């Protein structure tokens, strides 16, 4: 009987995959531009049509989407992967801001926080996106900053604001009113019943336009003096981070109670660094380093490579259980071992990403029931080293590299026992908002072979605008911890980058770019990207089918974003989010394995993706059918 049910499920899976998508796949021969807003995608298309490459177009889309407050602002952060067809290498761009002067555990604890705050001027790291755009454009683009920023500047001068953004402003207006410069920009109808812009109203951001114009003026003045293109863009960069823009930014930050100093801005710079990557069944999958959560997806792929996923059937109970367990194991490692490598000593990334360690972790999966106690493993022996944190792990109740499925309550640190109450209750709306907290993605490719994947964020609504710059500050400080027993590698310190959720992706096959993909959604990002990748590689979906396919989400992890209390971040072992369309018999199986189920119509992103079809010389694009994500190809 079980064999018959399994066969029926596989046949049903094939039938489901054959269903038409809600949005058509995008096709192009010359270029592809995809991001979170239609107007921002149009900005990329305009740059392509003016002769720019994929890096130029990606920078234009990034600038436009920042200007449109697509869950980020100009004061946020930029993380990018770029495939350079000239060197045939994938490049990692780290334009994440850092903790400012004075940002220490003692400082935040003195104010009653268990984590840095999620909103307000104390939540701000230094801005990274302006520097990230300047760096990418200088080294890998072809156009001037003036050309690339032109669409964003046109938007800042006034564009018809979308209902989603306008309503977000109205919803958050009570908080926005606490900050004078945010109130001035975002609430043009103060005193009226609706104080935010209406949908379709021309939304003007004069302060931001002035800031962008100052950067362009610095570039153009340098060119008139005979400076090179590189030197001219550097002049624009310096005006933002060291000149009069920096002066006003810091004045506005400190007036409102923030910590960022002129020295913090002047000392920060974007970094080009080595990628992190693994091979999954002949496909090289690239991520950023462990200051992001990206390697967690690579760890999960290494674990899942030990199983025949295709034979399980797409979203069968066994498949869901296997993916859930692999994600839990990799996220448990993320929550303890990941952090800014520049501040790390003896960080075990080689061990964490080794195939041998993955086999060890795969052997810990119990196929009878969920393991509510999955904790960090011990990757150090796989580097020939001894784990310096064994006493700490044991004090927290963890037994690395052991079957802990029947160990009572060992998932949580002893000092966090208070948050263990109601652990199997379905997550509430506030928890899910923190789990899914959004951003946007930028994906671009061209016929020359340039491929770009960017996951920017920070400065989302309700944001604190820094003085008269029009620039919303980042809120990424909340991703640090204050207690080394939670994660010894991610404790806040001045000049340090927080361990973020932002995670662009590029996959290579047979030495050529194969996929570029990204997603919004906080801690769910690498969960959804993992399943997108498996949907394409294991189940043969197109990029559009894979962006629309139903995924699962685990809540069995420490939240990276959210409240400043321990109970706001607590893991929820066994909590499993499923799509509304999951069949009854799958639900029954999963409940029998100890899962607490919740259901949503949207469980897949929104994901944006590009597939490079070398066989036919074309480019495919996939863009989620949820939200405003949009793509244009030619």
Stretch-by-stretch model annotation:
Residues 19-42, 46, 52-235, 240-292, ...:
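Noncatalytic scaffold domains of N-terminal-nucleophile
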Residues 309-457, 601:
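Internal maturation/activation junctions in enzymes
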Residues 294-310, 507-515, 523-547:
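M16/insulysin-pitrilysin zinc metalloprotease superfamily fold
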Residues 55-61, 146-157, 240-243, 249-250, ...:
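Short, well-structured alpha-helical segments that form the helix of a local strand-helix-strand
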